[in-house]
């Protein structure tokens, strides 16, 4: 019989085996005939053990051990079964969290979730017409086995079978949930701690064992490892501390508490050894992700005292910190130039070039971005897909280089790359910004088919509606039509889509051709109603609401604009002091006016509603049933600029007064107070410029000039804002007002824009002599 013995009454997987052979005198019962032996069946129940019976006629009985055998075996079997149950619970993944065993049925009424791995190939196949059958697809090679398989022998001997049981083996399918692998390491360390911990183990084996833990899992196991070192009364060596630091620096951001731990570990490392270049590189990377760039100068000073050269990785971390964390474009460019001209070792690679080009595109320096792109190509560096798509997006924003936008996108196909999700989003953005609604709708339809719709893509679709220009008013061709490849691309993809077959219930009108602006207004209203019902979280973005409201501003009337403005946005009153207002309404003496108003209302109600054709009836029902702001976005400065612009365009004085009053309330809110003083002043100046234009469109020139005169010392007025007022004054024959406006422009140009005065220029010419 196989006997299982517990060591010191502690559950462990260290097994001792002994063979006990009973004699024939164990029982007084008559012997039963033993049938011939058969092959053992491998189908056993969990925890069942079938003992072998062996007989020996010459063996003498041991009555003392025989008496204790049944009780000990029962206890040992009970303990073994309970321990096996514990291990099974750790090994068994949760069904609701297992991405391999659970299959969630998609909801066709909602925009589908993104599957980035399959979306790019599917969209590329749909657009290019080269989509292959799934049966002919070659399966991808299996991923490499996870780390942590090679455990030192003395630790493996202490753990027993648990080291092979919990760590995943090399199989054809290693797509195990990440949570399961993390729990394996946690259970492995806890079992090692119960089996004696680190006492008696060599430091080399312990360090080798801990080095096998993946950094993502090590980040959460640091307290347990420190506790094991303390129990064994062993000092933590500096390589282990450095492993802790490397695991804590994973991710895009580092919290202040994590930064305190990192500083503590670096102090422990410095007590055991001198800090080397690797330590300083990781330290600077940690401060960059913690957004404390000001402390980097002190670290660089320490390196200078120790005669440690600044490495290329340190420069790269500093450049990325200025670009993505500090948003300091100029200092990023200065550091980038230092990398190029300092030494050959610090020459920037294609990743640094890509980051700097992205920063130039973000700050609308397209010409500098193109210069860096051609410089990168001259040095023979590789060009990646994200760089080309970013340059295409940047060129579409520039009047000078917008014709090159689609050229960069088609270079992605020239390289033979499958466009990724970012490339498709930039493709949507370029078509939307150009006002090519037909192409934008088709690209979005393809993304619906491949379940790769993002909120950014949805925002670009609404943007295309706001940039739409009717064919009889459009003076320029679409940018894609200026390229021969673009003409073929647009023609083929428009013919390939049938809008009469909706995908996921998305309410595209069944036509690929856009006849007029009413089509755009109607479809945008239907899409907004569909999004309110299925994806209300999309509607809380202010940029999306601004594009939705701009559609009515450019293509609709005042009624449609005000309806969209009120139904899609609201004033966030957080931080606004509550003031009690009392309105006194005095009764009018002329009663016939009431009858006149009622007759006017009857006449207007009898007239047909022109907005009924362009407004979704479902949206009307939703707005009647929804009274809160859960489907609206809080208003910001840009939305108020659009509102005051609409008041001037449609010449609605009461709406302008309403927006002017509400904008004053908005300045008292927390959302406005959280802005920097520079941003607040910039937003106020933009609103003042639109207010001047609004009063000018209503022929209220004195009110417009009063706005300018009241803020002449605060805002840098220029001809860009005052040109409309000056031209209107000239048309109405108000020469004095036009002269006053010109004087304001001259004074502010000298004060804010650095232009020289006329008298100073004459003095300069006289001194110069020519």
Swiss-Prot record:
Transit peptide: 1-90
InterPro entries: Pentatricopeptide_rpt, TPR-like_helical_dom_sf
Listed name of the protein: Mitochondrial 15S rRNA processing factor CCM1
Organism: Candida albicans (strain WO-1)
Biological process annotations from GO: mRNA processing; RNA splicing
Record localization: Mitochondrion
Subunit field text: Binds to mitochondrial small subunit 15S rRNA.
GO cellular component: mitochondrion
Family: Belongs to the CCM1 family.
Gene that specifies this protein: CCM1
Chain segments carrying region Disordered: 28-67, 90-114, 588-610
């Amino acid at each position: 019989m196989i006997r299982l013995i517990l060591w010191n009454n502690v559950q462990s997987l260290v097994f001792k085996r002994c063979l006990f052979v009973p004699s024939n005198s164990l029982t007084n019962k008559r012997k039963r005939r033993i049938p011939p032996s058969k092959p053992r069946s491998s189908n056993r129940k969990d925890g069942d053990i079938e003992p072998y019976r062996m007989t020996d006629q010459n063996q003498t009985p041991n009555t003392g051990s025989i008496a204790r055998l049944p009780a000990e075996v029962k206890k040992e079997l009970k303990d073994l079964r309970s321990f096996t149950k514990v291990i099974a619970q750790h090994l068994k993944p949760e069904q609701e969290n297992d991405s391999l065993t659970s299959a969630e049925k998609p909801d066709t009424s909602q925009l589908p979730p993104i599957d980035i791995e399959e979306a790019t190939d599917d969209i590329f196949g749909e657009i290019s017409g080269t989509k292959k059958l799934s049966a002919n697809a070659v399966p991808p090679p299996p991923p490499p086995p996870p780390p942590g398989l090679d455990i030192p022998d003395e630790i493996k001997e202490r753990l027993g079978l648990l080291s092979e049981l919990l760590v995943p083996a090399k199989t054809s399918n290693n797509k195990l949930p990440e949570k399961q692998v993390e729990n394996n390491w946690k259970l492995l360390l806890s079992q090692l701690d119960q089996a004696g911990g680190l006492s008696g183990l060599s430091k080399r084996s312990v360090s080798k064992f801990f080095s096998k833990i993946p950094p993502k899992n090590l980040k959460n196991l640091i307290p347990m490892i420190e506790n094991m070192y303390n129990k064994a009364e062993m000092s933590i060596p500096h390589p282990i501390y450095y492993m802790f630091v490397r695991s804590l620096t994973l991710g895009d951001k580092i919290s202040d508490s994590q930064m305190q731990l990192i500083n503590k570990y670096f102090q422990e490392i410095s007590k055991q050894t001198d800090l080397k270049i690797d330590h300083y590189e990781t330290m600077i990377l940690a401060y960059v992700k913690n957004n404390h760039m000001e402390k980097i100068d002190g670290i660089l000073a320490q390196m200078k005292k120790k005669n440690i050269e600044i490495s290329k990785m340190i420069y790269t971390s500093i450049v990325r910190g200025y670009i993505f964390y500090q948003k300091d474009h100029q200092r990023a460019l200065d550091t980038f130039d230092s990398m190029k001209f300092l030494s050959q070792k610090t020459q920037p690679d294609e990743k640094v070039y890509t980051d700097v080009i992205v920063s130039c595109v973000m700050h609308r320096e397209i010409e500098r971005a193109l210069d860096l792109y051609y410089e990168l190509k001259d040095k023979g560096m590789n060009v990646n897909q994200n760089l080309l798509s970013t340059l295409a997006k940047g060129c579409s924003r520039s009047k000078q280089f917008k014709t090159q936008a689609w050229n960069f996108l088609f270079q992605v196909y020239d390289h033979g790359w499958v466009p990724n999700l970012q490339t498709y989003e930039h493709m949507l953005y370029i078509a939307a910004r150009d006002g090519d609604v037909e192409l934008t709708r088709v690209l979005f339809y393809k993304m619906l088919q491949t379940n790769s719709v993002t909120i950014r893509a949805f925002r670009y679709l609404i943007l295309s509606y706001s940039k739409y220009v009717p064919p009889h008013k459009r003076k320029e061709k679409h940018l894609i039509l200026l390229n021969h490849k673009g003409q073929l691309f647009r023609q083929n993809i428009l013919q390939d889509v049938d809008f009469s077959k909706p995908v996921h219930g998305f309410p595209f009108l069944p036509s690929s051709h856009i006849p007029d602006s009413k089509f755009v207004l109607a479809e945008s209203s239907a899409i907004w109603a569909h999004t309110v019902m299925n994806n209300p979280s999309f509607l809380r973005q202010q940029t999306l609401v601004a594009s939705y409201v701009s559609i009515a501003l450019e293509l609709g009337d005042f009624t449609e604009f005000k309806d969209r403005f009120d139904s899609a946005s609201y004033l966030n009153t957080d931080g606004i002091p509550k003031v009690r207002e009392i309105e006194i309404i005095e009764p009018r003496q002329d009663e016939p006016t009431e009858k006149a108003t009622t007759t006017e209302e009857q006449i207007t109600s009898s007239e047909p509603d022109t907005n009924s054709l362009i407004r979704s009836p479902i949206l009307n029902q939703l707005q009647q049933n929804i009274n809160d702001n859960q489907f609206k976005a809080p208003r910001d400065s840009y939305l108020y600029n659009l509102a005051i612009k609409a008041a001037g365009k449609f010449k609605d004085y009461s709406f302008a007064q309403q927006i002017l009053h509400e904008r004053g309330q908005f300045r008292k809110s927390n959302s406005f107070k959280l802005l920097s003083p520079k941003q607040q002043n910039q937003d106020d100046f933009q609103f003042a410029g639109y207010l001047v234009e609004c009063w000018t469109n209503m022929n209220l020139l004195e009110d417009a000039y009063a706005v300018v005169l009241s803020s002449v010392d605060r805002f840098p007025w220029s001809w860009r804002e005052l040109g409309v007022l000056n031209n209107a004054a000239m048309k109405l024959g108000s020469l004095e007002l036009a002269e006053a406006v010109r004087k304001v422009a001259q004074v502010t140009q000298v004060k804010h824009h650095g232009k020289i005065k006329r008298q100073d220029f004459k003095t300069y010419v006289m001194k110069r002599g020519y």
